[in-house]
Amino acid sequence: MTLNQILKFKRKKSVKKKKTPALLSSPQKKGICIKVYTTTPKKPNSALRKVCRVKLSNKNEITAYIPGEGHNLQEHSNVLVRGGRVKDLPGVKYHIIRNVYDLSGVINRKTSRSKYGKKK
């Protein structure tokens, strides 16, 4: 900006874009599964990643990742969603929390148990 522009107008404040807009500043939100399916990751990686479409309690519809090995999610299952993107899946900015509501924890998990809802 030139000096004349600064005298005439205020400087514009830069607005930070939220990384998880669908959660509306909440740490987690409850939702209902609409569709459970697998998808393939971006270029250097190869797998079948488990994801699901979730309708949140605030009527937003998002795509969320199901972490860990194996799951028991079906259509109309209740889930708890947190923020956190999956780097190699474009458009997936949310994770489902294991062992809350209808999603069970990972069976036979020994390490990092708290992240996958496995009791001791």
Curated annotation (Swiss-Prot):
Task: Output the Gene Ontology cellular-component terms.
Answer: small ribosomal subunit
Gene3D superfamilies, alphabetized:
Nucleic acid-binding proteins
Record-annotated disulphide pairs: none
Q: Which GO terms describe its biological process?
A: translation
**What CDD domains has UniProt attached to this entry?**
Ribosomal_S12
Q: Which SUPFAM superfamilies match?
A: Nucleic acid-binding proteins
Q: Which GO terms describe its molecular function?
A: rRNA binding; structural constituent of ribosome; tRNA binding
Q: Which UniProt keywords apply?
A: Methylation, Ribonucleoprotein, Ribosomal protein, RNA-binding, rRNA-binding, tRNA-binding
The reply on keyword Cell inner membrane is no
Q: Tell whether Acyltransferase is among the UniProt keywords.
A: no
Per its UniProt record, what InterPro entries does this chain match?
A: NA-bd_OB-fold, Ribosomal_uS12, Ribosomal_uS12_bac
Sites of the modification 3-methylthioaspartic acid?
88
Function field? With S4 and S5 plays an important role in translational accuracy.
Q: Which NCBIfam families match?
A: rpsL_bact (TIGR00981)
Which protein family is it in?
Belongs to the universal ribosomal protein uS12 family.
Per UniProt, subunit arrangement is: Part of the 30S ribosomal subunit. Contacts proteins S8 and S17. May interact with IF1 in the 30S initiation complex.
**Entry's PANTHER family?**
30S RIBOSOMAL PROTEIN S12 FAMILY MEMBER
Q: What is this protein called?
A: Small ribosomal subunit protein uS12
To which species is this protein native? Carsonella ruddii (strain PV)
